[in-house]
Amino acid sequence: MAYNKSDLVSKIAQKSNLTKAQAEAAVNAFQDVFVEAMKSGEGLKLTGLFSAERVKRAARTGRNPRTGEQIDIPASYGVRISAGSLLKKAVTE
């Protein structure tokens, strides 16, 4: 089961001796910084945990699965997230 935001806030509050309000403020601040970094194209790296970068996806041709009609899919941006060494090690043990 994945943690949702309230689960994450509770865990951070427990582990760091913060109140839930303080932990929620920290999570919200991280979320804001993360989104700003992705929007600006700067990327974000937490050494050992993960790195994230904004990537451009090229325009391409696809097919409508219902009709089989060929459609043009415009270029867009996405996010590429790569696991860091600490995270990789933790999940393989």
UniProtKB/Swiss-Prot annotation:
Record-level GO BP terms: chromosome condensation
Disulfide links within the chain: none
GO molecular function terms noted in the UniProt entry: DNA binding; structural constituent of chromatin
Functional note: Histone-like DNA-binding protein which is capable of wrapping DNA to stabilize it, and thus to prevent its denaturation under extreme environmental conditions.
Keywords, alphabetical: DNA condensation, DNA-binding
Gene3D superfamilies tied to this protein: IHF-like DNA-binding proteins (4.10.520.10)
Family in the record: Belongs to the bacterial histone-like protein family.
Name used for this protein in its record: DNA-binding protein HB1
Organism: Bifidobacterium longum (strain NCC 2705)
Subunit structure comment from the entry: Homodimer.
SUPFAM superfamilies reported for this sequence: IHF-like DNA-binding proteins
PANTHER family according to UniProt: DNA-BINDING PROTEIN HU, DNA-BINDING PROTEIN HU-BETA
InterPro entries documented for this protein: Hist_DNA-bd (IPR000119), IHF-like_DNA-bd_dom_sf (IPR010992)
GO CC annotation: cytosol
Pfam families in alphabetical order: Bac_DNA_binding (PF00216)
